[in-house]
Amino acid sequence: MPFDPLLFAQNTVILPEIIVIVCLLIVLVLDLIQENSAWLSTISLTGLVAATIALVFQWNHPSANDFLGSIQVDNFTISFRGIITISSALSILISTEYIKRAGMGLAECLIFILTATVGGLFLCGANNLVTVFVSLECLSLSSYLLVGYAKKDVRSNEASMKYLLMGGASSSIIAYGFSWLYGLSGGEIELSKLVDGITNHIDEPIAVWVALACVVVGIGFKLSAFPFHQWTPDVYEGSPTPVVAFFSVGSKAAALALATRMLSIVFPSIESEWHVLLELLALLSMIFGNLIAATQTSMKRMLAYSSISQAGYLIIGIVCGNIYGYTGMITYMVTYIFMNLGAFGCVILFGLRTGTDQIRDYTGLYLKDPLLAFCLSVCLLSLAGIPPLAGFFGKLYLFWCGWKSGLYLLVYVALITSVISMYYYLRVVKSMFTRETKEQSSYVRNYLAPSLSLLPTTSIEVGIALCVFISTTLGFVINPIISATSETLLATNTIVG
């Protein structure tokens, strides 16, 4: 029988993960042969693009299990795995220039990002407690190393230690919750088989509630949802900016997939209870994330608190508990990739040219670098939900799904806090476009403006251009994307009846 690559991609459940692992090994070996080779980034990007293509081939095919049922593949998991590979590829695009100029080892950073990507990919489809925990730790350990990657920077070392201690505590809590689930189910580890144990012990609510609370706390930490967000501002501020960009999307996507599958599959008998818990997390995250973001003076800290509020918006999709809520969550997550990574790319580029990330230092940027000011403005306005940018349509559909599901309080709070977010996003845009020379910051006054060119010349400029283009145009094709996603999720998804 002749080899059919399409059939191979469809029937190999973990083909995308295999591609990324092979790519990781090639980067490792190549760096041993030729340190900081120019091919390292190209190989990493090629592997991630190939993994994304493999996911496209798997899309809309019957659900499949592999490795004795430890990995589940359906359109829901494929969607989130695609989000992770795309966000990793964009993170590498916008980080390569930064790493080279900072004099840090490129191979190590790429290896950590690819390892975290593998952990995130497996976590999205993990179908038993062991696979979930191992995948989560693969993602977490790589993240700790990425945070402390700039080892000569005291702030990076401090951030790494904080993240390690708090991450270790959250892993311990979720492992404790898993031990309760294992005991309640009579020794089962597969997610679908844990349900009977929970149902049989519904008359012992304390045991079930302890297990649920531990799972929610562990996932809340990864989502950086309030009040489990304490690590986020300090880690975001102390970490290298490209690392922060990767965290803001990649780990959040993996945590969302895990939260949706764990809660929907394992705890259907107490659905109303965990809905209340998640509604509370969403409300607190949206309110406090936006209020505190409005007081920040650092761009990285502002985007950190903004990501907390974004987690609150995304949780609305989980609480909906239906195909439309999941579609809204995935749609908004796709728009979030490009507008958030685009904003971080602009912050990285400005930091490389000025050495600062303070909001006041962006004053008057338009006069020196109109293209960078325009790109950052587009991404921030999209994050704020200003039409006709992609962020507006993503938020609109997600909030509509929440309204149709009867989550009126959540939607009202989401709308009010979205208005609050406009204040701190527009504040940056306003300061960049001030025309008074005397109001320019000293950093902008001494800014070495590049020659004006519409064609990107470096990898970071390519990444920013791609994010800005998609953030601008995605809204015009959002309806076909929503329709296709909802139809295929309804046809093949295993977490929705």
From Swiss-Prot:
<feature type="transmembrane region" description="Helical">
    <location>
        <begin position="164"/>
        <end position="184"/>
    </location>
</feature>
<keyword id="KW-1133">Transmembrane helix</keyword>
<feature type="transmembrane region" description="Helical">
    <location>
        <begin position="332"/>
        <end position="352"/>
    </location>
</feature>
<feature type="transmembrane region" description="Helical">
    <location>
        <begin position="13"/>
        <end position="33"/>
    </location>
</feature>
<comment type="subunit">
    <text>NDH is composed of at least 16 different subunits, 5 of which are encoded in the nucleus.</text>
</comment>
<feature type="transmembrane region" description="Helical">
    <location>
        <begin position="373"/>
        <end position="393"/>
    </location>
</feature>
<dbReference type="InterPro" id="IPR045693">
    <property type="entry name" value="Ndh2_N"/>
</dbReference>
<feature type="transmembrane region" description="Helical">
    <location>
        <begin position="37"/>
        <end position="57"/>
    </location>
</feature>
<feature type="transmembrane region" description="Helical">
    <location>
        <begin position="311"/>
        <end position="331"/>
    </location>
</feature>
<feature type="transmembrane region" description="Helical">
    <location>
        <begin position="206"/>
        <end position="226"/>
    </location>
</feature>
<dbReference type="GO" id="GO:0019684">
    <property type="term" value="P:photosynthesis, light reaction"/>
</dbReference>
<keyword id="KW-0874">Quinone</keyword>
<keyword id="KW-1278">Translocase</keyword>
<keyword id="KW-0472">Membrane</keyword>
<protein>
    <recommendedName>
        <fullName>NAD(P)H-quinone oxidoreductase subunit 2, chloroplastic</fullName>
        <ecNumber>7.1.1.-</ecNumber>
    </recommendedName>
</protein>
<dbReference type="GO" id="GO:0048038">
    <property type="term" value="F:quinone binding"/>
</dbReference>
<feature type="transmembrane region" description="Helical">
    <location>
        <begin position="462"/>
        <end position="482"/>
    </location>
</feature>
<keyword id="KW-0618">Plastoquinone</keyword>
<feature type="transmembrane region" description="Helical">
    <location>
        <begin position="240"/>
        <end position="260"/>
    </location>
</feature>
<comment type="similarity">
    <text>Belongs to the complex I subunit 2 family.</text>
</comment>
<dbReference type="InterPro" id="IPR001750">
    <property type="entry name" value="ND/Mrp_TM"/>
</dbReference>
<dbReference type="GO" id="GO:0009535">
    <property type="term" value="C:chloroplast thylakoid membrane"/>
</dbReference>
<feature type="transmembrane region" description="Helical">
    <location>
        <begin position="76"/>
        <end position="96"/>
    </location>
</feature>
<keyword id="KW-0793">Thylakoid</keyword>
<feature type="transmembrane region" description="Helical">
    <location>
        <begin position="103"/>
        <end position="123"/>
    </location>
</feature>
<dbReference type="Pfam" id="PF19530">
    <property type="entry name" value="Ndh2_N"/>
</dbReference>
<keyword id="KW-0520">NAD</keyword>
<feature type="transmembrane region" description="Helical">
    <location>
        <begin position="406"/>
        <end position="426"/>
    </location>
</feature>
<dbReference type="InterPro" id="IPR010096">
    <property type="entry name" value="NADH-Q_OxRdtase_suN/2"/>
</dbReference>
<keyword id="KW-0812">Transmembrane</keyword>
<keyword id="KW-0521">NADP</keyword>
<comment type="function">
    <text>NDH shuttles electrons from NAD(P)H:plastoquinone, via FMN and iron-sulfur (Fe-S) centers, to quinones in the photosynthetic chain and possibly in a chloroplast respiratory chain. The immediate electron acceptor for the enzyme in this species is believed to be plastoquinone. Couples the redox reaction to proton translocation, and thus conserves the redox energy in a proton gradient.</text>
</comment>
<feature type="transmembrane region" description="Helical">
    <location>
        <begin position="129"/>
        <end position="149"/>
    </location>
</feature>
<keyword id="KW-0813">Transport</keyword>
<dbReference type="GO" id="GO:0008137">
    <property type="term" value="F:NADH dehydrogenase (ubiquinone) activity"/>
</dbReference>
<dbReference type="GO" id="GO:0042773">
    <property type="term" value="P:ATP synthesis coupled electron transport"/>
</dbReference>
<keyword id="KW-0150">Chloroplast</keyword>
<keyword id="KW-0934">Plastid</keyword>
<dbReference type="Pfam" id="PF00361">
    <property type="entry name" value="Proton_antipo_M"/>
</dbReference>
<feature type="transmembrane region" description="Helical">
    <location>
        <begin position="274"/>
        <end position="294"/>
    </location>
</feature>
